[in-house]
């Protein structure tokens, strides 16, 4: 398990350990029974998420708030996102520094 990546819900479902956000835990409470480190958002994460939202809206490709927040949390901490969710590719278009796996 990589320690330099956040697992999105789409990946965390099958994982036993790693780093997830509180949003993944809320989306899938059984994750609490696994060995995950849980990240909580900071003020800067919301600022970055708003920047992502503005850029996506300008391109006409808005995505869900939770995905934007997870991406923002990864960007703020220089982490990648491991995901099977295509919305993160849309985010990467406007934030190319977002690492995806």
Question: Which residues does each predicted region cover?
Answer:
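Acidic, PIN/NYN-like endoribonuclease modules and their adjacent C-terminal/linker elements
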Residues: 1-4, 71, 75-101
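PIN/NYN-family metal-dependent endoribonuclease catalytic core
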Residues: 4-47
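Residues within well-formed alpha-helices
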Residues: 8, 48, 52, 71-73
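Conserved glycosyltransferase catalytic-site signature
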Residues: 9, 64-68, 85
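Hydrophobic packing residues within well-ordered alpha-helices of enzyme cores
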Residues: 28, 49, 88-91
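Residue-level signal for well-ordered alpha-helical positions
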Residues: 31, 52, 94-95
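Conserved SAM-binding loop
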Residues: 38, 63, 81
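Mid-chain, well-packed structural core segment of small domains
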Residues: 51, 58, 63-70
């Amino acid at each position: 398990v990589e320690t330099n990546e956040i697992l999105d819900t789409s990946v965390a479902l099958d994982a036993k350990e790693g780093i997830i956000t509180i949003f993944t835990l809320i989306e899938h409470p059984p994750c609490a029974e696994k060995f995950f480190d849980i990240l909580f958002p900071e003020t800067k994460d919301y600022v970055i998420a708003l920047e992502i939202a503005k850029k996506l809206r300008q391109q006409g490709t808005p995505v869900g708030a939770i995905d934007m927040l997870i991406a923002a949390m990864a960007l703020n901490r220089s982490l990648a996102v491991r995901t099977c969710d295509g919305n993160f590719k849309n985010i990467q278009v406007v934030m190319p520094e977002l690492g995806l796996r």
